[in-house]
Structures are given as C-alpha cells and as structure tokens.
From Swiss-Prot:
Functional summary from the UniProt entry: Is required not only for elongation of protein synthesis but also for the initiation of all mRNA translation through initiator tRNA(fMet) aminoacylation.
GO BP of this protein: methionyl-tRNA aminoacylation
A single MF term (Gene Ontology): metal ion binding
Designated gene of the protein: metG
UniProt xrefs under Pfam families: Anticodon_3, tRNA-synt_1g, tRNA_bind
Protein name: Methionine--tRNA ligase
Binding-site residues for ATP, renumbered to this chain: 338
Organism: Cupriavidus metallidurans (strain ATCC 43123 / DSM 2839 / NBRC 102507 / CH34) (Ralstonia metallidurans)
C-alpha cells in the first residue's frame, strides 16, 4: 500500500496571550490524528506558527515598553514550551513574522492582482479621536447588525457567525479608549470574493467538505444556487500604524492579519522544507497529489472555507483537501471563568504537577468528528482517568509483569500467544483505525476500554496470584502472564496516539521496538525478555484539581489579605449603618456592568477612569478611587456592580456617570486594600441587582 503524503495544520495561536485548555482541545485533537497517521506509515508533516501581526500586539508591546518583535519572541517561547509539555508534535513551529511569510504574502497578492481579483476603493473607517488612529476590527465593539447581539467585535459576530465591516456595527465604541469613534475615509485593498469565478469555485469545493455542519454553513453563506451571490469582497488591508507586512507599492498600507495568518501555514512548511530538503512546490502546487488538512475552531470556519481556498485557487496553489472544525470547551458546564478558576492555562496545569496525558486522554474520550461543544467535567475527569487508565489499562501490566520477571526471567511463553483473546484484540484494529482516521476518538477509546475489560476478565478468571502459589501450575501461570502482557502490548498500540509518553514507557518495559500499527501483527518474543515493571502513571488526586483551580482563581488572590484583616478582630469591622426601609433601598438602582476599558488618570494617584457597558447600547464613563488596588490591565473584561442612577458628577478630570462599588476595611491605613464587587460569571451587563 502506497504511503499517503499529508500536510496538517492547527489554527495559529495569537501572540498576545497564554495558551489555555480551550486552545489545547484543538492541538490535542490534531496531534492524535497526526500521530495515528505516522503510526500507519504515512509521510506526515504537522506545522504551526504563532500569529504575530496586528494592532493588539503593537499596543501591548507599547504598553509594556518593548518592541513588538521582543513581545512576539517572548510569547513564541512560552507557546512552544506549552505545546512541548502537552506532547504536541509539530514538525515545525514557526512565526508569521518571518521572511518566508512576507515573500509568500507578496507572491499570492500579486498573483491575485494579476487575475484582476484585487481592487481598490475608498472606505469610511472608524477613527479613535483620543488615540489618533484608525481602529482595527477587534478594537471596535458594538451590536451585531444582523442579530443584535451586544459586545461584538468589528469584523464578525460570535453569536450568529455573520461577518461585516466595522461601520455596520450599531452603537460602536473604541475598545482602546472607550471613546465613540468618528468616521474617516481611507483607500483600502479588497480581494474580490464576489467575482463569479470565486462563487463557482466555492460551490464546487464545498461539496467535498467532510462535516455536514460546515457544508450547511457554507451553503448559507453562499446563498441558493442561481440567485444573486451573497458573497462580499474582503478588505485585506489596514492603515498605519500597524505591525505587519507592508503591501507592495502601497506605502502606509499593510496586509490585514487574516490574510497573512493562513499563509503562515505555508511559510512554516516552506521553512521546514528548506531545512529537510522537501520539494515545497510538489506539496503545495496546483497539481499536488499530497493531502492538506486544517484543524480549526468553528468560530473561524468562514475564513478557512471561503477566503483561504479561494485565495489559494486563484494564486496558483492547491486547495485544502478538507477543513475539520471542532466546538468550544466548557468547564463543569459553563464557560471558562477566571473568578471560578476554570480559565485554566497550560502552564498552570503543568506547574501544579498535573500529567498532560490525563487531559489528552479525557479530551480524546469526548472528541468526535462533529462541531459540537465538549465539556470538561472535573469530577468526571478524575473518575475517568483513574478508572480507565489506571484501574483498567495499567492494572493489567501491574498484575502480570512481576510474576513473569521473577518466575520466568521476563521471557514469554510464545506458544501461549495463540490464545483467542489476542485474536479478538487484533480483529478490532481495522475498526479502531477507521475511528482514528475519522476523528471519532470517543468511539475509539470506548472500544479500547471494552477490549481492556475483556483482558481484565481474562486475568480475573486465570488468577495468576493464585496460580503462583502452586508450583504444579507453573505452566498455566506462565501462559496467563504471557497472554496478559501481549494483550497489554496490543492495547498500548491502540492508545499510543493519545498517550505517547506512557506508550514509550511501555515499549521500554516490554523491551520492544517503537510500536506502530504494523506491530499489531507481531508479538512479544522470548528472545527479548520483559523488564521489571515500573509505575507507568499515577492517579489523579482531587487535591491537585483544587490546587489547579486555586492557581487560576485570580480574584481570590486579592481577597486573601481581606480575609486576614477580618480575622484580626471586631475592631476592624465597620459598624452597620442605621436601618433603612425597603423603599429607601429601592431608590438605588444597582446594575451589573462590564469594564470594557480602563486607564490611569493623569494628575491623580488615586483615580482610574473606567469605561463601562451597562447593556444600554452605549458606554458610561466612571471615575473610581481604586488605583491603589488595581492596574488598568487587571480590570478590563471584569464584571462589577455600579450605582446606575447616581446623578452624574462633574469632576476635575471629566464627567463621572455612576459609582463602582468596592469593599474596604473601616481603617484603611491599618488594613489597606480596596476590592471591587464581582458578580457571578453568569450575570450579564445591565442585569439589576435586587
């Protein structure tokens, strides 16, 4: 059978933050598939890169007092560390801020221009009058023009999936300053996705998508065949100041990050090809016989199934074989939350001593070929890992290996390996291969655990610990242990794409060559004695989960000193105020607000200027004397409580349109600290507190 040639990518993480477990769903899903393909003997290259360009990187670097290059180099190191820790086996992990990417972006752009698929037109953009800059899509928020969802970015709605231009937003505001943006005109470059050639191509291309949900969504975007196209031209340029690649022949104009990011897949592969002597053009050229797959989150399906394939098709490159989208991750049935400690970073997971293969196994047990969301239930996580991997799988080796090594010098009884149980395990290989190929990992692991149950039943029936007590049953003991360990070897092959480090430990323990799918037809040999058994994996301790949540619960870190102050005695507690009536309380309108922006107030060492979203369709400006307790960066994105009907107050620094509630001790000098009130993460801006 001829080996397949496969190029695989995962979406590129943005170089503006940490890798968290939500990201890891995708990289683990991809890595399992890649490892399986390698075990099948296919020629596979898995490439990735940091997505490094855009205004967010530029502004964060400015805030930190470093260059964008220094920022992206640091974040690249952090991301690579996290991927290595979670055994994500990239053949090359690169950066979109690379010369290969610049060259490819220019080449593709010029090819599209030669095909008359690039056009220029003046567009009216939002401009921040406070920061004196055009606002990129992700630095404008407002209401979706289609579904009305609030707090949506300027390029696409995360609720309904619609894409639009920023000026279509209702009630927009600048995320940078909180100001209401003004409109200014600027010349921009567009990829003519509305061209009939693009529509015709995309209608043909969508027919081959593997996921029905993706095909249906694309049909929705394309509209009914025979009707006028619903495709819009794509703005591929941004104005200076911008961190990215300048467009050839257009000073002060830069490629939009969403143009150069997917091209970064090819740039990473080109870098790998040059290092390994791979024929790059043979893999990505229009007549390539290689396969190309992109694993992505369902939120970026639009870019990968419309813009990217059309861009490739008309610039002289091959198009993707398929795009595989996955759903979002929830933790204990809810969105990841910093206040609950469930916004778990990859680094915090490993720093607290958690085994990355526990998470790899759990995610695999939940993943399938659909775009449905998956939930990390922490109680189930502990139970499943401890039951499946330790109680069932590892238990087989621990119950058989000791007897084989002590009584038989580690040598198996090869004649005993004709046992029907082993044939049962081998017969499952084609079905398991089909599950892995189809990304039906949950089905694969259910079948593996069924086989594991059968092996444990064999061990329980033969009771090697009882056979070992009777010398006359030495042959039966030898056979039982030999069959058990050969079964363990086969199960390890089936689990290796998911838990590669543990599989490597099994290979050393069983004294076998690295296991691939072809090894299913082999067996343990008496010529290569099994080594003394060593623990392959420890159980998950609930205390580790508690420590992990605590490490990620940032709001509790600030609350700890307050708790200590409270314990100091009644003198630290301010007396309760005079009694009021329910009518008095009803006059105060307390609302949940989201802090969308925060800045220090020049000339004040106490005040912070907060831009708040109360769900009114516009933002409010509030000054709060909490600078001693928080930096602006700590507050952006948090929910808090505001007195919404407090009369606006004109202050030296501007108008304050409400009051943020915060807690403090009666004697702030003796017990310093201010702590804003943070509602439950399920609350939304505008909810009234009663």
């Amino acid at each position: 059978m001829t080996a397949r040639r496969i190029l695989v990518t995962s979406a590129l993480p943005y170089a503006n933050g940490q890798i968290h477990i939500g990201h890891l769903v995708e990289y683990i899903q991809t890595d399992i598939w890649v490892r399986f393909q390698r075990m099948m003997g296919n020629e596979v290259y898995y490439v990735g890169a940091d997505d490094t360009h855009g205004t967010p990187v530029m502004l964060r670097a400015e805030k930190e007092g470093i260059t964008p290059k220094q920022l992206i180099d640091r974040v690249w190191t952090e991301h690579k560390r996290d991927f290595d820790n979670f055994l994500v086996s990239f053949d090359n992990y690169y950066s979109t801020d690379a010369e290969e990417n610049r060259q490819l972006c220019e080449k593709i752009y010029l090819a599209l221009k030669a095909e008359d698929l690039i056009t220029e037109r003046d567009v009216e953009q939002f401009y921040d009058p406070v920061k004196n800059m055009f606002l990129p899509d992700r630095f404008i928020k407002g209401e979706c023009p289609k579904c009305g969802a609030k707090d949506q970015y300027g390029d696409s709605c995360e609720v309904c999936g619609t894409t639009y231009v920023p000026t279509d937003l209702k009630n927009p505001y600048s995320v940078v300053s909180g100001a209401t943006p003004v409109r200014k005109s600027s010349t921009h470059f567009f990829f003519k996705l509305s061209d009939p050639r693009c529509e015709t191509f995309l209608r043909e291309w969508v027919a081959d998508l593997a996921q029905p949900e993706a095909s249906n969504k694309m049909q929705e975007w394309l509209g009914a065949e025979g009707e006028a196209s619903t495709l819009s031209d794509w703005d591929i340029s941004r104005d200076a100041p911008y961190f990215g690649f300048e467009i050839p022949g257009a000073p002060g104009k830069y490629f939009y990050v969403w143009l150069d990011a997917p091209i970064g897949y090819y740039a990473s592969f080109k870098n790998l090809a040059e290092k390994r002597g791979i024929d790059f053009d043979a893999w990505v050229g229009p007549h390539s016989t290689a396969e190309q797959y992109h694993f992505i989150g369902k939120d970026i399906l639009y870019f990968h199934t419309l813009f990217w394939p059309a861009m490739l098709r008309f610039s002289g490159y091959r198009t993707p074989t398929n795009v595989f989208a996955h759903g979002f991750l929830t933790v204990d049935g809810a969105k990841m939350s910093k206040s609950r400690g469930t916004f778990i970073t990859a680094q915090s997971y490993t720093d607290t001593g958690m085994n990355p293969e526990w998470l790899r196994y759990y995610f695999a047990a939940k993943l399938n070929a659909s775009m449905e969301d998956l939930d990390l239930n922490l109680d189930d996580f502990v139970a499943r890992v401890n039951s499946d991997l330790i109680g069932k799988y590892v238990n087989i080796a621990s119950r058989a290996a000791g007897f084989l090594v002590k009584r038989f010098d580690g040598k198996v009884n090869e004649a005993a390996l004709a046992n029907p149980l082993l044939e049962q395990l081998r017969q499952a290989a084609p079905q398991l291969a089909q599950y892995y190929e189809g990304r039906e990992y949950s089905k694969a692991l259910r079948l593996v655990m069924e086989l594991t149950d059968a092996v444990n039943a064999f061990v329980d029936t033969n009771k090697p610990w009882e056979l070992a007590k009777d010398e006359s049953k030495r042959d039966a003991l030898h056979a039982a242990c030999s069959v058990s360990l050969e079964a363990f070897r086969l199960l390890t092959i089936y689990l290796k794409p998911v838990v590669p480090t543990m599989a490597a430990g099994v290979e050393r323990f069983l004294n076998v060559d690295p296991l691939d799918w072809r090894a299913i037809d082999k067996q343990l040999s008496a010529d290569r004695p099994v080594q003394p058994y060593q623990h392959l994996m420890t159980r998950v301790d609930v205390k580790q989960i508690d420590a992990l949540l605590a490490a990620n619960r940032d709001s509790l870190q600030a609350a700890a000193p307050a708790a200590e102050a409270g314990a100091a005695g009644a003198s630290a507690i301010e007396p309760v105020a005079d009694t009021i009536t329910i009518d008095d309380f009803a006059k105060i309108d307390l609302r949940v607000a989201k802090i969308v922006a925060c800045d220090k107030v020049e000339g004040s060492n106490k005040l912070l200027q907060l831009t708040l979203d109360l769900g009114e369709g516009k933002t409010r400006n509030v000054f709060s004397g909490i600078q001693s307790a928080y930096t602006p960066e700590q507050l952006v994105g948090k929910l808090t409580v505001v007195v919404a009907n407090l009369a606006p107050r004109k202050m030296k620094f501007g108008m304050s349109e409400g009051m943020v509630l915060a807690a403090s001790a009666a004697d702030e000098k003796a017990n310093p600290g201010l702590y804003i009130l943070e509602p439950h993460s399920g609350a939304v801006p505008g909810m009234r507190i009663r």
